[in-house]
Amino acid sequence: MPINGDGYFCLVKPVIYATKEGMKMKGHMDKVLAAAAAAAKAGEVPVAAAITDAKGDLIVLAENRMVRDGNALHHADLLAIEAAMAATGQSRLDGYDLWVSLEPCTMCAGAIAHARLRRVYFAAHDEKAGAVESGVRFFDNPSCHHRPEIYGGIG
C-alpha cells in the first residue's frame, strides 16, 4: 500500500480516510450527509451537495428543494453548482469538486460536465436514477465533452 509524505496510508480509489487530506474529505461528506438528513426532515428527497475549491475548502452546501420550491429542477447538485458559480463569479468551476449524498442523475451529470467540475464524490449509488456509475453512465458517452474524476460509494 502506498504511503504519502506524511507517513499515512493513501489510495486514490477507493478513497481511504487515513490521510490528513482524507480526514478533511470525510468532514465534507459528513456535512453533506447531515444536510441530506435535514432535507429529509423538511419533506424532501434526502439529498444534499457541496462544492469545494482547489484547496479543498468547502464554499457552498445545498439541499434538495424540489418539494419546498415546487420546482423539479431544484436538485441539490444543481443548486450547489449555481451557488458556487455565483460565489466565485465564474461560469466554469475548473479545479472545484462536487460532494453529493446520492449518485447524480442524468440532468445533474450534464450540469457537472458543463460546469467543468474536476471531481465528483458521492456517498450512495442510485440504481434507479443514477447516471454516473449506474444507469446511462453519462460520462462514458462519447458525446460527453468533459469527464470529471469519479469517486462513488464513499459515504
How would you label these PLM feature ranges?
Residues 1-2, 6-7:
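N-terminal amphipathic/hydrophobic targeting modules at extreme N-termini
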